[in-house]
Amino acid sequence: MTPEFMTPGRLAARTSRALEAAVAAGRGLGLTVTDPAVLHDVFSVVVHLAPSPVVVRVPTVLPTYAGLDTRAAQQRTELAVVSWLAEQSIPVIPPSPLVPQEPVQRDGFSMTFWQFVEQDTTVEPDYVHNSRLVADLHAALRAYPGDLPFLSTAEPRFTTEGLAALAYRPDLVDPADLDRARREWEILEPVVRSRAAFEAAFPGIDLQPLHGDAPAVNIVAATNGALYADFELATLGPVEWDLAALGPACEAAYNSAAQLRGLRQLDARVLRFINAVGRCRTVACLALAPQLPLLVEALKPSIEQWRGMPFDAGPAG
């Protein structure tokens, strides 16, 4: 059955359910919550449990296979990575010290609890500057002692299943675009799924713990300085993944900072590969549009740009 687009009423109801679950979970953990407020509502509903200095992130837009256990496992990894970084005095938004550092499940949602920080609303995002800070983060993450899955952030199952589902949605994607994305993904997927295949395709490219989700974009300008945030997709992979789709200026800024840190420069061939994976994932994201209708317009510029580009990023390229 083809999923229908969620109406504004259903979207609002989903937000309300997530808000109510976050408040109930917070109160269940002993927090005082009298004036909760939704701070963000896109892929997750982010709730400030005011007056408690706690923010809850409740993922709401998810692949069909991402059950509670899958979500909780991913969230435990995030909490472990961020807790370790905080212990090393790396500037992050840390888990809340007022509750156990574990995902909480309530009313069908799996959520995490974070320390509330005041944001400096006068600061404009500067992704070139932030890309320099990503090199600092990578230098710190190299010492992370925990185990991380290889390129789990690429979510190959999501891309494979998303592209398959779009075969029945010509209203969401042009069939010619979908055909191209599936052909490109057929080449890229084996290297994304297998560390051994990646290392064979890109010999000499070291792997390390990564943020996993555009860290230059996920740096929060707090009143006490810049803070790394949103490690939901923490993974093991090449550093190029964290610079995907940011462009030459950000890449140059990262390389400059990496050189000062004694880290390797970005590899152009790996970047082409990573960006090609990202473009296939962008097309696959249209499969989530029934859950999040704004994706149709939000993804259109990226897909139009991809349509005019050659595919030159195969592992053997």
Model-derived segments and spans:
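A cross-family kinase active-site recognition segment
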Residues: 121-183, 207, 317
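Conserved short submotifs of the Hanks-type protein kinase catalytic core
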Residues: 108-119
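Active-site Asp-x-Gly
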Residues: 209, 220-272
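Catalytic-loop signature of eukaryotic-like protein kinases
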Residues: 213, 217-219
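ATP-binding glycine-rich phosphate-binding loop
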Residues: 28-50
